[in-house]
Amino acid sequence: MGQVFLLMPVLLVSCFLSQGAAIENQRLFNIAVSRVQHLHLLAQKMFNDFDGTLLPDERRQLNKIFLLDFCNSDSIVSPVDKHETQKSSVLKLLHISFRLIESWEYPSQTLIISNSLMVRNANQISEKLSDLKVGINLLITGSQDAYMSLDDNDSQQLPPYGNYYQNLGGDGNVRRNYELLACFKKDMHKVETYLTVAKCRKSLEANCTL
């Protein structure tokens, strides 16, 4: 009986520590989701602002090219639809989100150089990407099952971004900016979706459907 009473304080402390860790985890998730939502909104605004400077025929042609083309980050293996996203583990969604954010660290800098209309937003984006990357890394490190072996596809390096647009031709600058912004918007939407689902799972909500 005495041993039971001795164990009770230990169990209570353990319970409080566990609750504290869960609260901190949710706080980090809230911050990460808020950051990526803001990034997604900035990406949409930058794309819409640039799209608004194009002539109708130019816009249609670039949209057709983009639909047939691919983004540099497409080499990162990620869920292809809502169903696959729902089936993915929290840790897998965090790892994919981290790699997607990491893949934009250099390209976000090129936006500052390539289009003077977007300098202010691009500066915001570079800083917010760095903050979000740190936050996602904390979530990965603090995960209860933080060990996850990456398969060959996950561990592959992205192709050098500098070579991605080397064969665009005479209209390369306009097409380059269009594809950069369209891909950035697409990837921020992905990360927002993945982090929102991961946050919901960690909060133990009954319904985490997209």
From Swiss-Prot:
Q: Which SUPFAM superfamilies match?
A: 4-helical cytokines
Which CDD domains does the record match to this protein? somatotropin_like (cd10285)
Instruction: Write out the GO biological process terms.
Output: animal organ development; calcium ion homeostasis; growth hormone receptor signaling pathway; hyperosmotic salinity response; magnesium ion homeostasis; negative regulation of testosterone secretion; positive regulation of growth; positive regulation of phagocytosis
Q: Which cellular components does GO assign to this protein?
A: extracellular space
Taxonomically, which superkingdom?
A: Eukaryota
User: Where does the chain bind Zn(2+)?
Assistant: 38, 192
Query: Does the keyword Zinc belong to this entry?
Result: yes
**Any idea which UniProt keywords this protein has?**
Disulfide bond, Hormone, Metal-binding, Secreted, Signal, Zinc
What the record says about family reads: Belongs to the somatotropin/prolactin family.
**Function, in words:** Growth hormone plays an important role in growth control and is involved in the regulation of several anabolic processes. Implicated as an osmoregulatory substance important for seawater adaptation.
Write down what this protein is called: Somatotropin
Q: Which species expresses this protein natively?
A: Oncorhynchus tshawytscha (Chinook salmon)
